[in-house]
Amino acid sequence: MIFSEDRGRYIKAQLPRGKVRRLAVDATMRASAPYQKPRRERQQANPQKKYMGRKVFIEESDVRSKRMARKAGSLIIFVVDASGSMALNRMQAAKGAALSLLTEAYQSRDQISLIPFQGDAADVLVPPTRSIALTKKRLETMACGGGSPLAHALSMAARTGMNAQKSGDVGKVVVVCIGDGRANVPLDVSLGTAEPLEPGTKPDRQALKDELIDTAKQLGSIPGFSLLMLDTENKFVSTGLAKDIADAAQGRYFKLPKTNEAAIAELTQGAVGAMKA
C-alpha cells in the first residue's frame, strides 16, 4: 500500500502538514462541533465581518486533511550481463521472463524494466512499464559483447527504482541480477569521470570488487528494495562473486548455470511474493 494526501481511498483523517490537498469535511466538522456555541456567542457579542452570515464556525485549528491509501505494484528490474559468450542466452532468457511476468502482472499493477550492461556502461533499455508492446519493441535492439560494467548497472537500477517509487505507482522494487558477478569496468569510467583503460591494461581486481560490494550495499539499504542474484557462472570452481554481491545487498542468491526464462520467471515471482507477504 502507498499512503498519500491526494490519491487513493480515504482511510482516515489527520492533522494537515502544510497545504491541505484533500479536506476531510467529516473530521473537520467533528473537530469544530464542541466549539460552535461559544464561537457563536463570541460573534454575537463582538461581530467580525469574516464570520457574518455563517451558521457553522470553522477555525484553522479544526481543519483536518484526508489520508489516502492505494494499492501499489512492484517494479521488477532485470539487470542482465550482456557481455561475454553467453550474453545472448542470458538476454533471451531475461526477455522471455520479462514478457511472461508482464502477461500475468495486469491485476497486480507490477511493472518491469530491463538494464543490460556491456561495453563501458549500462543502459536502461526498457524503462519501467506495463506495456508488452513497448517491451517487445525495445528488446529488438539488444547489443551484446564487450566489457562488464556491473557496478554501473546496479547504480542505475537503484536510480531507476527510486524514481519509480517517487512517482507513487510503485511500492516495492526487486532487482533481478542475471550474470556471474564479474566486473571489469570501474564505475568512474562508466560515469565518464575517468578515461577508459588502455588496451591490454587490466583493472585492479580488488578495487573493482570493493566498488561492486559497496554499490550492492547501497542498493540493499534503500527502503523497499530487494536483490535477487541469479548466478550464471558455469565454471567447475566458482569465484563466489555473485554470492558476495547478494550477501552485501542482503538479497537472495540462486545458482542458475543453465539460464532459462521459466526458471527466471518462477524465482522472480517468488521474490516478489516474499516482499509482498
Predicted regions and their residues:
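Short, basic/glycine-rich phosphate-binding loops at helix/coil junctions
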Residues: 132-136
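Short small-residue beta-strand/loop micro-motif enriched in glycine and branched aliphatics
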Residues: 85-87, 137, 185
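Von Willebrand factor type A / integrin I
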Residues: 159-171, 185, 189-277
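Von Willebrand factor
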Residues: 29, 68-128, 144, 151-156, ...
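Well-ordered alpha-helical segments embedded in enzymatic catalytic cores
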Residues: 62-63, 97, 153-156, 211-214
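Catalytic metal-binding/acid-base residues of hydrolase active sites
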Residues: 182
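A glycine-rich helix N-cap at a beta->alpha junction
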Residues: 138-147
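Acidic/polar low-complexity segments with low predicted structural confidence
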Residues: 1-73
